[in-house]
Amino acid sequence: MSARTKARKRALDVLYVADIRGESIPATLAVEQQRAAAEPDRQASWAYAREIAEGFVEHQDEIDELIETYSVNWTLARMPAVDRAILRIGIWEILFNADVPDGVAISESVDLASSLSTDESASFVNGMLARIAAAQA
């Protein structure tokens, strides 16, 4: 597993935990940063995980508005928390990280959905992110 793939998973953990616990993302990031500092093998992926989470916080309103706009018959509040977190990461990478090709952002998000969410989530995430990427092109 590449360092960026691990970082996406760590960012997903941060967004998911903050969402489920009703905590702020910066507070959850602070806890994770302490954990990463204590475990050298986590430090390689930590910088990009933090960049993703902080980037989402900076652009949360825009990202969540896109999710609401492009999700058919699913409000943000109604979708599973893990799917919300995956979509937020994928959209942030598509819109705000020029170093990651859209196809890679979509593929990595679909892989996360396949391994961590429902059977239908991977195709839902794929369709949503593909439509958003196409609209931004």
From Swiss-Prot:
UniProt GO molecular function: RNA binding
Cellular component annotations (GO), alphabetically ordered: cytosol
Gene3D superfamilies: NusB-like
GO biological process, one term: transcription antitermination
Keyword line: RNA-binding, Transcription, Transcription antitermination, Transcription regulation
Source organism superkingdom: Bacteria
Keyword presence, Transcription: yes
Keyword RNA-binding (UniProt): yes
NCBIfam families according to UniProt: nusB (TIGR01951)
HAMAP family (alphabetical): NusB (MF_00073)
Family membership: Belongs to the NusB family.
Function per UniProt: Involved in transcription antitermination. Required for transcription of ribosomal RNA (rRNA) genes. Binds specifically to the boxA antiterminator sequence of the ribosomal RNA (rrn) operons.
Protein name per Swiss-Prot or TrEMBL: Transcription antitermination protein NusB
Organism: Clavibacter sepedonicus
